[in-house]
């Protein structure tokens, strides 16, 4: 027997028992007559000790380095009261070693387990990094999350059905990872960005409750919280309304938070996309932050200040105010930093007004734009924003998107900087009624979610007549400012699907070439269906309290989509490329 107990499972009830432990040397203290070691496995750490009276095993112990892999046999002993370590789960006991087997000693480590290592070091030696208790705990939590999800899905009649990894490239927003076919020379498979079409086809096949915990792939420009391969909890249902789907999934997340964190999330509020953008400048609002944007275009449309009156009178303009309680104490340097910050989002500046004394008229206001605004205007602004003495007002005035993005980001930053955001709270919500389409930089329409999302309460003819104002029957679950899941009611009418493709500029020939199988399937009694997908990586981030998505993935990629440990991607064997009919063209470096 290599192991009778996990290290972290030992406690006072095991005193007097002989146990066999297998794990790694975590720390060593040589006190001359005794050598104390902490032995670690995935469940925790326990202290063992060697007595010099047993010369043979004492000699072996003297040769062991940190991270040596060993087997320990010994007797569990209660520590003296004065020696109890309350910082350790096993701190009431220790193990007197009677025998030791060295599976493998360890070379000098390239990582220092007692210090912060660079992320590059951690990713290069990931197998060592994962031995750290805090990393092991995150992956154990991830496993428990997936176990909970599987139980919940099984209890609610869902079937776990796998969908293909090698599939056809279809336009879903990001670039596909392509896999060349040796058998079909010159043709390529695509790795799925999501199982979207296959899960819809499963609904058409009669499997009315499907789920899958599945890898997805997107070849896109990466951010700190994105990975080229990521894991979804993918869900689809037939004969359920959007409200019923949301209730099912809300109950799952509610149960998950109780199971993992003993936190009751309560009933999730529902907010339209329009309300979220107006009040918070984001379609994934962090409701732990009490600050809100207040629209004031009607108050400022007649002032003699172009920065305000032009967007206030423009159809695509927006003028809004962010009131920060006690913000009048901000220094000019801090305000200048916020001005630079909103510039990242396209804002040309950041007007502000300190309300030093709300009862002193213009004399109680300090602002570089005060000369353009009279007392009546300021009185209206103060009333609209509920400002009081000691507050500061930040103004956003520009095109609607610029103001919404910049002021929404400023709201988050100020909330963090001034400790207004309650970091101990959990604030979930549903965001619904997204626009069906959005305009790209060239003014063309693209699907805000994906082209299989159903519009809300529209016929194909009505949608074609006014696509810009169409509302999608879509919904996102947001927790603490993170979109953890999103979905929609799907199109199940072939005419509606062709109409959406047409609005997106996909002609009939391309529709048949790219989606012919879907359009055919829609003709044969397709049921109404709806679903969504959760990001497992992001859920695990939230539950474990980390802000780095790489901490909850066993073997993640860098932000450059590389694996430092295996050195992937790598150059392919020339013979393999020849068999595939592929020639690699070297890109010329930009001068």
Curated annotation (Swiss-Prot):
* Region span, Aspartate: 196-199
Name its GO BP terms in alphabetical order.
Answer: aspartyl-tRNA aminoacylation
- Protein function: Catalyzes the attachment of L-aspartate to tRNA(Asp) in a two-step reaction: L-aspartate is first activated by ATP to form Asp-AMP and then transferred to the acceptor end of tRNA(Asp).
Per its record, how is this protein called by name? Aspartate--tRNA ligase
Task: Describe the reaction catalysed, as an equation.
Answer: tRNA(Asp) + L-aspartate + ATP = L-aspartyl-tRNA(Asp) + AMP + diphosphate
Q: Which InterPro entries match?
A: Aa-tRNA-synt_II, aa-tRNA-synth_II, aa-tRNA-synth_II/BPL/LPL, Asp-tRNA-ligase_1, Asp-tRNA-ligase_1_N, Asp/Asn-tRNA-synth_IIb, AspRS_core, GAD-like_sf
Originating species: Actinobacillus pleuropneumoniae serotype 7 (strain AP76)
Per UniProt, the keywords (alphabetical) are: Aminoacyl-tRNA synthetase, ATP-binding, Cytoplasm, Ligase, Nucleotide-binding, Protein biosynthesis
Q: List the CDD domains hit by this protein, alphabetically.
A: AspRS_core, EcAspRS_like_N
Family per similarity comment: Belongs to the class-II aminoacyl-tRNA synthetase family. Type 1 subfamily.
Q: What class of enzyme is it?
A: ligase
Q: Annotated Gene Ontology MF terms? A: aspartate-tRNA ligase activity; ATP binding; nucleic acid binding
Give the chief site where it resides.
cytoplasm
